[in-house]
Protein backbone atom coordinates (compact mmCIF):
# COMPACT_ATOMS: atom_id res chain seq x y z
CA UNK A 1 0.00 0.00 0.00
CA UNK A 2 1.32 3.48 -0.79
CA UNK A 3 2.36 5.08 2.49
CA UNK A 4 3.30 8.63 3.44
CA UNK A 5 6.46 8.80 1.27
CA UNK A 6 4.74 7.44 -1.84
CA UNK A 7 1.70 9.70 -1.46
CA UNK A 8 3.85 12.74 -0.68
CA UNK A 9 6.01 12.02 -3.73
CA UNK A 10 2.87 11.81 -5.85
CA UNK A 11 1.65 15.12 -4.41
CA UNK A 12 4.95 16.86 -5.14
CA UNK A 13 5.08 15.57 -8.70
CA UNK A 14 1.45 16.40 -9.50
CA UNK A 15 1.21 19.82 -7.87
CA UNK A 16 3.11 21.89 -10.48
CA UNK A 17 1.28 20.08 -13.29
CA UNK A 18 -2.27 20.70 -12.08
CA UNK A 19 -2.27 23.89 -10.03
CA UNK A 20 -4.60 26.44 -11.62
CA UNK A 21 -6.03 23.91 -14.05
CA UNK A 22 -9.78 23.31 -14.27
CA UNK A 23 -10.91 19.77 -13.55
CA UNK A 24 -13.27 19.37 -16.47
CA UNK A 25 -14.41 15.81 -15.88
CA UNK A 26 -13.81 12.74 -13.72
CA UNK A 27 -14.31 9.72 -15.97
CA UNK A 28 -15.07 6.31 -14.46
CA UNK A 29 -17.59 3.47 -14.50
CA UNK A 30 -17.83 2.72 -10.79
CA UNK A 31 -19.91 5.23 -8.79
CA UNK A 32 -19.76 3.02 -5.71
CA UNK A 33 -15.98 3.30 -5.59
CA UNK A 34 -15.63 6.83 -6.98
CA UNK A 35 -18.32 8.78 -5.15
CA UNK A 36 -19.91 12.12 -5.92
CA UNK A 37 -17.11 13.04 -8.30
CA UNK A 38 -19.42 15.27 -10.35
CA UNK A 39 -19.24 17.78 -7.47
CA UNK A 40 -15.57 18.38 -8.36
CA UNK A 41 -16.10 18.89 -12.08
CA UNK A 42 -15.79 22.34 -13.64
CA UNK A 43 -13.73 23.71 -10.74
CA UNK A 44 -10.20 25.09 -10.73
CA UNK A 45 -7.56 23.27 -8.68
CA UNK A 46 -6.26 25.62 -5.99
CA UNK A 47 -3.92 23.29 -4.11
CA UNK A 48 -2.83 19.67 -3.77
CA UNK A 49 -2.49 18.62 -0.13
CA UNK A 50 -1.87 15.37 1.72
CA UNK A 51 -3.12 13.95 5.02
CA UNK A 52 -1.66 10.61 5.97
CA UNK A 53 -2.16 8.35 2.95
CA UNK A 54 -4.81 10.60 1.39
CA UNK A 55 -4.35 13.10 -1.45
CA UNK A 56 -6.63 16.14 -1.31
CA UNK A 57 -7.23 18.27 -4.38
CA UNK A 58 -8.57 21.60 -3.08
CA UNK A 59 -10.95 23.09 -5.64
CA UNK A 60 -12.63 26.45 -5.93
CA UNK A 61 -16.07 26.80 -4.39
CA UNK A 62 -15.10 25.05 -1.16
CA UNK A 63 -14.89 21.57 -2.68
CA UNK A 64 -12.27 18.82 -2.41
CA UNK A 65 -11.59 15.72 -4.44
CA UNK A 66 -10.13 13.24 -1.97
CA UNK A 67 -8.12 10.29 -3.26
CA UNK A 68 -7.14 7.22 -1.27
CA UNK A 69 -4.75 5.05 -3.25
CA UNK A 70 -5.72 1.79 -1.56
CA UNK A 71 -3.32 -1.14 -1.91
CA UNK A 72 -2.00 -0.51 -5.40
CA UNK A 73 -3.39 2.81 -6.61
CA UNK A 74 -1.55 5.80 -8.01
CA UNK A 75 -1.81 8.62 -10.51
CA UNK A 76 0.01 8.31 -13.83
CA UNK A 77 0.55 10.74 -16.68
CA UNK A 78 -0.12 8.04 -19.27
CA UNK A 79 -2.91 5.42 -19.37
CA UNK A 80 -2.13 1.87 -18.24
CA UNK A 81 -3.95 -1.47 -18.58
CA UNK A 82 -5.16 -0.88 -15.01
CA UNK A 83 -6.54 2.64 -15.44
CA UNK A 84 -9.80 2.81 -13.44
CA UNK A 85 -10.57 6.54 -13.59
CA UNK A 86 -9.31 9.65 -15.36
CA UNK A 87 -9.13 13.27 -14.25
CA UNK A 88 -9.53 15.34 -17.40
CA UNK A 89 -7.94 18.77 -17.03
CA UNK A 90 -7.51 21.61 -19.51
CA UNK A 91 -4.10 20.64 -20.79
CA UNK A 92 -3.65 17.02 -19.72
CA UNK A 93 -5.32 13.98 -18.21
CA UNK A 94 -4.32 12.21 -15.01
CA UNK A 95 -4.95 8.46 -14.98
CA UNK A 96 -5.83 6.62 -11.78
CA UNK A 97 -3.94 3.33 -12.01
CA UNK A 98 -5.20 0.66 -9.59
CA UNK A 99 -4.62 -3.05 -10.36
CA UNK A 100 -6.37 -4.37 -7.23
CA UNK A 101 -9.22 -1.84 -7.25
CA UNK A 102 -9.04 -0.80 -3.59
CA UNK A 103 -8.52 2.90 -4.35
CA UNK A 104 -11.25 5.48 -3.81
CA UNK A 105 -12.19 8.98 -4.96
CA UNK A 106 -14.61 11.21 -3.04
CA UNK A 107 -16.07 14.56 -4.02
CA UNK A 108 -16.82 16.42 -0.78
CA UNK A 109 -17.39 19.87 0.64
CA UNK A 110 -14.10 21.01 2.11
CA UNK A 111 -13.51 19.35 5.46
CA UNK A 112 -16.70 17.27 5.37
CA UNK A 113 -15.23 13.80 5.76
CA UNK A 114 -18.26 11.95 7.11
CA UNK A 115 -17.93 9.44 4.25
CA UNK A 116 -14.23 9.04 4.98
CA UNK A 117 -14.08 8.34 8.74
CA UNK A 118 -10.38 7.44 8.69
CA UNK A 119 -9.57 11.02 7.72
CA UNK A 120 -11.34 12.24 10.85
CA UNK A 121 -9.18 10.22 13.23
CA UNK A 122 -5.71 10.74 11.78
CA UNK A 123 -2.97 11.72 14.19
CA UNK A 124 -0.27 14.31 13.54
CA UNK A 125 1.88 14.30 10.43
CA UNK A 126 5.22 12.76 11.52
CA UNK A 127 7.29 15.16 9.41
CA UNK A 128 5.49 18.25 10.71
CA UNK A 129 6.12 20.45 13.75
CA UNK A 130 2.85 19.16 15.20
CA UNK A 131 4.52 15.77 15.69
CA UNK A 132 6.20 16.60 18.99
CA UNK A 133 7.93 14.08 21.22
CA UNK A 134 5.82 14.66 24.38
CA UNK A 135 2.60 13.71 22.60
CA UNK A 136 4.29 10.75 20.91
CA UNK A 137 5.66 9.47 24.22
CA UNK A 138 2.29 9.92 25.90
CA UNK A 139 0.62 7.92 23.11
CA UNK A 140 3.09 5.09 23.64
CA UNK A 141 2.60 5.06 27.40
CA UNK A 142 -1.18 4.90 27.04
CA UNK A 143 -1.13 1.73 24.93
CA UNK A 144 -0.44 -1.90 25.77
CA UNK A 145 -0.51 -2.88 22.09
CA UNK A 146 2.60 -4.16 20.32
CA UNK A 147 4.68 -1.34 18.85
CA UNK A 148 4.07 -2.48 15.27
CA UNK A 149 0.29 -2.54 15.75
CA UNK A 150 0.27 0.92 17.34
CA UNK A 151 2.39 2.45 14.56
CA UNK A 152 -0.08 1.15 11.96
CA UNK A 153 -3.07 2.62 13.81
CA UNK A 154 -2.74 6.11 12.18
CA UNK A 155 -3.69 7.94 15.39
CA UNK A 156 -0.14 8.08 16.73
CA UNK A 157 1.45 9.13 13.42
CA UNK A 158 -0.51 9.59 10.20
CA UNK A 159 0.66 7.84 7.05
CA UNK A 160 2.90 5.15 8.57
CA UNK A 161 2.35 1.70 7.08
CA UNK A 162 4.00 -1.69 6.97
CA UNK A 163 7.22 -0.72 5.21
CA UNK A 164 8.18 2.28 7.28
CA UNK A 165 7.04 0.85 10.61
CA UNK A 166 9.37 -2.12 10.09
CA UNK A 167 12.25 0.08 8.96
CA UNK A 168 11.85 2.58 11.81
CA UNK A 169 11.67 -0.16 14.43
CA UNK A 170 14.82 -1.75 13.04
CA UNK A 171 16.66 1.56 13.01
CA UNK A 172 15.58 2.19 16.61
CA UNK A 173 16.62 -1.38 17.57
CA UNK A 174 13.21 -2.10 19.06
CA UNK A 175 11.15 -5.27 18.83
CA UNK A 176 7.87 -4.93 16.93
CA UNK A 177 6.32 -7.17 19.61
CA UNK A 178 7.19 -4.93 22.58
CA UNK A 179 4.17 -3.45 24.39
CA UNK A 180 4.28 0.24 23.57
CA UNK A 181 3.92 1.32 27.19
CA UNK A 182 7.03 -0.65 28.18
CA UNK A 183 9.39 1.74 26.39
CA UNK A 184 11.66 3.98 28.42
CA UNK A 185 11.90 7.63 27.48
CA UNK A 186 15.27 7.00 25.82
CA UNK A 187 13.85 4.13 23.74
CA UNK A 188 10.86 6.25 22.77
CA UNK A 189 13.18 9.05 21.63
CA UNK A 190 15.07 6.55 19.47
CA UNK A 191 11.85 5.47 17.82
CA UNK A 192 10.66 9.07 17.38
CA UNK A 193 13.92 10.03 15.64
CA UNK A 194 14.04 6.85 13.57
CA UNK A 195 10.50 7.31 12.31
CA UNK A 196 11.17 10.86 11.17
CA UNK A 197 14.52 9.95 9.61
CA UNK A 198 13.20 6.96 7.68
CA UNK A 199 10.19 8.85 6.34
CA UNK A 200 12.24 11.91 5.35
CA UNK A 201 14.80 9.76 3.53
CA UNK A 202 12.07 7.84 1.73
CA UNK A 203 10.38 11.05 0.58
CA UNK A 204 13.72 12.36 -0.68
CA UNK A 205 14.19 9.16 -2.72
CA UNK A 206 10.66 9.10 -4.13
CA UNK A 207 9.25 6.29 -1.98
CA UNK A 208 9.66 2.52 -2.34
CA UNK A 209 8.86 0.50 -5.45
CA UNK A 210 8.54 -3.16 -4.49
CA UNK A 211 8.87 -6.28 -6.62
CA UNK A 212 5.22 -6.13 -7.71
CA UNK A 213 5.96 -2.72 -9.30
CA UNK A 214 2.51 -1.48 -8.20
CA UNK A 215 3.86 1.87 -7.02
CA UNK A 216 5.59 4.17 -9.44
CA UNK A 217 5.83 7.93 -9.59
CA UNK A 218 3.37 9.71 -11.92
CA UNK A 219 5.91 9.77 -14.75
CA UNK A 220 6.38 6.01 -14.44
CA UNK A 221 9.76 6.13 -12.74
CA UNK A 222 10.29 3.87 -9.71
CA UNK A 223 11.02 5.12 -6.23
CA UNK A 224 14.49 4.61 -4.79
CA UNK A 225 14.16 3.90 -1.09
CA UNK A 226 13.71 0.14 -1.58
CA UNK A 227 17.48 -0.07 -2.03
CA UNK A 228 17.85 1.07 1.59
CA UNK A 229 15.41 -1.40 3.13
CA UNK A 230 17.21 -3.08 6.01
CA UNK A 231 14.49 -5.60 6.90
CA UNK A 232 11.25 -5.04 4.98
CA UNK A 233 10.82 -7.69 2.27
CA UNK A 234 14.17 -9.29 3.18
CA UNK A 235 13.06 -12.47 4.95
CA UNK A 236 15.95 -14.95 5.08
CA UNK A 237 18.52 -12.42 3.91
CA UNK A 238 21.31 -11.27 6.24
CA UNK A 239 20.68 -8.36 8.57
CA UNK A 240 22.88 -5.47 7.38
CA UNK A 241 24.00 -4.85 10.97
CA UNK A 242 24.75 -8.34 12.34
CA UNK A 243 24.37 -10.83 9.49
CA UNK A 244 21.67 -12.97 11.09
CA UNK A 245 18.81 -13.84 8.70
CA UNK A 246 15.90 -11.43 8.81
CA UNK A 247 12.70 -13.08 10.06
CA UNK A 248 9.06 -12.51 9.20
CA UNK A 249 6.16 -12.97 11.59
CA UNK A 250 2.62 -11.64 11.77
CA UNK A 251 1.70 -8.75 14.07
CA UNK A 252 -1.83 -7.36 14.05
CA UNK A 253 -2.53 -9.33 10.89
CA UNK A 254 0.40 -7.81 9.00
CA UNK A 255 3.62 -9.43 7.88
CA UNK A 256 6.42 -7.98 9.99
CA UNK A 257 10.13 -8.13 9.18
CA UNK A 258 12.74 -7.81 11.92
CA UNK A 259 16.16 -8.96 13.10
CA UNK A 260 15.94 -11.19 16.19
CA UNK A 261 19.47 -10.26 17.26
CA UNK A 262 19.30 -6.49 16.82
CA UNK A 263 15.69 -6.06 17.91
CA UNK A 264 14.94 -9.05 20.16
CA UNK A 265 13.45 -12.46 19.53
CA UNK A 266 9.84 -11.60 20.25
CA UNK A 267 7.20 -14.06 21.48
From Swiss-Prot:
The residues listed in the UniProt record as binding DNA, with positions renumbered to this chain, are 82, 100
Q: Which reaction does it catalyse?
A: Hydrolysis of DNA containing ring-opened 7-methylguanine residues, releasing 2,6-diamino-4-hydroxy-5-(N-methyl)formamidopyrimidine; 2'-deoxyribonucleotide-(2'-deoxyribose 5'-phosphate)-2'-deoxyribonucleotide-DNA = a 3'-end 2'-deoxyribonucleotide-(2,3-dehydro-2,3-deoxyribose 5'-phosphate)-DNA + a 5'-end 5'-phospho-2'-deoxyribonucleoside-DNA + H(+)
Origin, by domain of life? Bacteria
Keyword Lyase (UniProt): yes
Record keyword Methyltransferase present:
no
Q: Name one Pfam family in it.
A: Fapy_DNA_glyco
One MF term in the entry's GO annotations: damaged DNA binding
Q: Tell me which CDD domains the record gives.
A: EcFpg-like_N (cd08966)
| Coiled coil regions, renumbered to chain | none
Any binding details for the cofactor?
Binds 1 zinc ion per subunit.
What does the record give as EC number? Answer: 3.2.2.23, 4.2.99.18
Q: Where is the active site?
A: 2-3, 53, 254
Write the record's keywords in alphabetical order, separated by commas: DNA damage, DNA repair, DNA-binding, Glycosidase, Hydrolase, Lyase, Metal-binding, Multifunctional enzyme, Zinc, Zinc-finger
Q: Which metal ions or organic cofactors does this protein require, according to UniProt?
A: Zn(2+)
Q: Where are the zinc fingers (FPG-type)?
A: 230-264
Single biological process term from Gene Ontology: base-excision repair
Functional note = Involved in base excision repair of DNA damaged by oxidation or by mutagenic agents. Acts as a DNA glycosylase that recognizes and removes damaged bases. Has a preference for oxidized purines, such as 7,8-dihydro-8-oxoguanine (8-oxoG). Has AP (apurinic/apyrimidinic) lyase activity and introduces nicks in the DNA strand. Cleaves the DNA backbone by beta-delta elimination to generate a single-strand break at the site of the removed base with both 3'- and 5'-phosphates.
HAMAP family named in the record: Fapy_DNA_glycosyl
Q: Which family does it belong to?
A: Belongs to the FPG family.
Assembly description: Monomer.
Question: What is the name of this protein?
Answer: Formamidopyrimidine-DNA glycosylase
Q: Which organism is it from?
A: Thermus thermophilus (strain ATCC 27634 / DSM 579 / HB8)
Q: Which gene encodes it?
A: mutM
